[in-house]
Curated annotation (Swiss-Prot):
Subunit structure: Interacts with LEF-2.
Region annotation (Disordered) ranges: 244-266
Signal peptide: none
Family: Belongs to the baculoviridae LEF-1 family.
Protein name: DNA primase
Stretches with biased composition (Polar residues): 257-266
Entry annotated with the keyword Transcription regulation: yes
Keywords: Early protein, Transcription, Transcription regulation, Transferase
One Gene Ontology term from the biological process aspect of the record: viral genome replication
EC code(s) of this entry: 2.7.7.-
Length: 266
């Protein structure tokens, strides 16, 4: 494994991005590919940085809060099939944009490129996305973005996740034929890790940390995604025009009939 160089500034960024950073434990992978599950807390980012340097840490993962305190809602999408780096990043940007449209900017804390072949979208702590939300609640919400076997544009409801993926495809693949839209929507549909989203006991990669598989540090892409949305939809985020993400009253058995926006069920 290649040696990665953490700086105090990098660890400060990690520290500031982690809620309850001094009240939760961490898991560390060393440059020798050994996991350390530290049974301790860190009071400051300086303490965390010192530990990382002393133990030659590569990857940093955040654990749930102790005593069943829960964990953030995180969408973890990973793309195993891609042609090249450009194709991978296109899939990442389309998938992450679909979730931004689905959950809306007001509910998204940050979107991180993982440093390898996917993205993590962290949701904000709200009444809809409580850190203490039980697993069955998360499983129910996960069903909204399970990939269907096939799509028919005539039966996709505004506000559904399928609609959001389709709009994201339109945004990033502007010169496609409408006849290819359903196939492209399925092609770019993000593959979400069910265990990470639903299992409150799973650890998650710390924002801005190093990813030994991709040999890169993770980076925040939220601004890039929002800038693209606002450039193409000038009213996005201000109540103006843009992709429809309001709740509709669907008629079974249309696709998306159980997939409304965060303003109603998520």
């Amino acid at each position: 494994m290649l040696v990665c160089n953490y700086t105090q500034k990098r660890v400060d960024m990690m520290w500031d991005a982690i809620a309850y950073n001094d009240s939760r434990k961490y898991a560390f992978m060393t440059v020798n590919a050994r996991w350390i599950h530290a049974d301790r807390y860190f009071d400051t980012s300086a303490q965390l940085y010192s530990y990382i340097v002393q133990n030659k840490v590569s990857d940093v993962h955040v654990k749930p809060l102790d005593d069943g305190g829960g964990r953030e809602w995180v969408v973890d999408a990973d793309y195993k099939n891609y042609v090249d780096e450009h194709d991978l990043m296109l899939k990442i940007y389309i998938g992450a944009t679909a979730f931004l449209l689905f959950y809306t900017e007001e509910n998204v804390s940050r979107v991180m490129y993982t440093g390898n072949r996917g993205f993590h979208l962290w949701l904000k702590f709200t009444d809809k996305f409580k850190i203490t939300s039980a697993q069955n609640v998360r499983v129910h919400r996960y069903k909204a973005f399970e990939k269907p076997a096939k799509l028919d544009s005539d039966y996709i409801q505004p506000g559904s996740f399928a609609h959001c993926v389709r709009e994201a495809v339109r945004l990033y693949v502007p010169h496609m034929q409408d006849s290819n839209l359903d196939a492209l929507t399925l092609q770019y549909w993000p593959d979400v890790d069910r265990d990470i989203f639903c299992n409150v006991n799973k650890q998650i990669r710390a924002p801005y940390s190093y990813n030994y598989k991709g040999t890169k540090f993770s980076r925040c892409i939220t601004k890039e995604l929002l800038d693209k949305l606002k450039q193409c939809y000038p009213g996005y985020g201000t109540g103006g025009c843009g992709p429809v993400t309001t709740t509709t009253t669907p008629s079974p058995p249309k696709i998306g009939s159980m997939q409304t926006t965060t303003k109603s069920t998520t």
